[in-house]
Amino acid sequence: MASKDTTTGDEANIKLPANDHFEIQSDKASSDASDITYTPPSSSTSMTSASSFGAPASSNEIDASSQPSGVSNISIREYIYLLPYPLPTNTPVPYSIHVPAKNPLKLPPFLSEPTSTLVLTSPHGTFVDVRLFKSAQSGQSAPPNEGERSRLEWAFAGISTSRPTVDQHTTDDEDKWENVTHSTWTHWLDSRYPIGSREIPVDEGDMYPIDAIRTLEHGHGYQPRMKAMMTHEEMWRDVDAMSTNALGSKMCVVLRLKDERFGARGVVVRVGQYCQGIMALVAQESCTVERWEFHGGDAERDNGLGRERTEAQQWKRTARVGDLFLPCAVTFRTEILRVGGLIRYKDYLWTVEEAWEWE
């Protein structure tokens, strides 16, 4: 049985000194006991609009000077189905949604998902995609939480873009799919490649809307386990963002680390009840990834017992691979964070790049 992590957000032990900085004890399960500090932006850059964290959520933007290019998104992969590349002529696309009733290529007649795959995307298109192998051992279905690198299938972060396109695979105009889009994911960090590598391949695919919450991605790429280029179809299910606070508002936060001196890059994205991060160093071949999930209801207080159950206390780290520190727990203190704020841990300085609130 895999050991369960009991680290929760309340172990961050946030303090608010008089100098308008606050300290957060680092996650004891992911680094040493050193403090990290947050410095808010200067008064010239901090926002005081009604949409700022801690204020009524009348709109979805903290930084009123920047308009969103999209919406926050939470996606869980339901399955991946591999096909030959290139596809034989006249192969129906999408293909996997018809299996096993219609299977002209005589491929495996079942759909499977060997990983726990979650993608979090911000309104400006910054995303973190983490894919962790499910355990083959009975009773170990949960993602790894003790740094087991062998359980990391793939993790990457960057910018996603999407544009309308036409169905390229259906010849009969009457049968062509509508509302198809072409998406591209540019990898700024990739667990399979060194930082700044020019060998990271183009990651793109056509997105076919299946129903109100599911989208099928059709594309192709190199499959390490097959050691070959393969066509793939992935079914993605959208998950609604949930409120984690007593106000009932929903949050999205993006943190970024880019330090050329130390050869460090990192991205943390929180959307609603999920948070994921990835960090890598030029000096290391491997990266660190984390996933956190909110467990419980809205933040609540129990003054009669002299205790308070805060939002931060209800977050739990559900997956971790690697040994670097990731400031995921900082995103749980949205009432303090502002765009442009700086989070320092030892030599590394993270920036609050996006911060959103909506109803």
Regions from the language model: what does each represent?
Residues 2-155, 165-359:
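Lipid interaction determinants
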